[in-house]
Amino acid sequence: MKARLLLLSVVILVGMVSAENEKAGSCPDVNQPIPPLGLCRNMCESDSGCPNNEKCCKNGCGFMTCSRPR
């Protein structure tokens, strides 16, 4: 029982931390006729890894990169 309570607490804390790291706005649409390509490698893992107000978004290559929100 204590292990379940501890696991539940950890899940809640992780959810709170990830919600705090998300920046305002939404990622650019990569389902355009000509998607924004960017570099074909991961440049970030979450919004907190991006400078200023940029968000960590998928690019046209399928990798994650910092982008200006729309």
Curated annotation (Swiss-Prot):
Expressed, tissue-wise, as follows:
Expressed by the venom gland.
Start and end residues of each WAP domain: 20-70
Give the record's keywords alphabetically. Answer: Antibiotic, Antimicrobial, Disulfide bond, Secreted, Signal
GO process annotations (BP)? defense response to bacterium; venom-mediated disruption of cell wall in another organism
Against InterPro entries, the record matches this protein to:
Elafin-like_sf, WAP_dom
Question: Which residues form each disulfide bond in the chain?
Answer: C27-C57, C40-C61, C44-C56, C50-C66
Record flagged with keyword Membrane? no
> Where does the UniProt annotation place the signal sequence?
1-19
Q: Name one GO molecular function term.
A: peptidase inhibitor activity
In which broad location class does this protein mainly occur, judging by the first location in its UniProt entry?
secreted
What's a single GO CC term here? extracellular region
Compartments, as annotated in UniProt: Secreted
Q: Which family does it belong to?
A: Belongs to the venom waprin family.
Q: What does this protein do?
A: Damages membranes of susceptible bacteria. Has no hemolytic activity. Not toxic to mice. Does not inhibit the proteinases elastase and cathepsin G.
Name of the protein in question:
Waprin-Thr1
What organism, scientifically named, is this protein from? Thrasops jacksonii (Jackson's black tree snake)
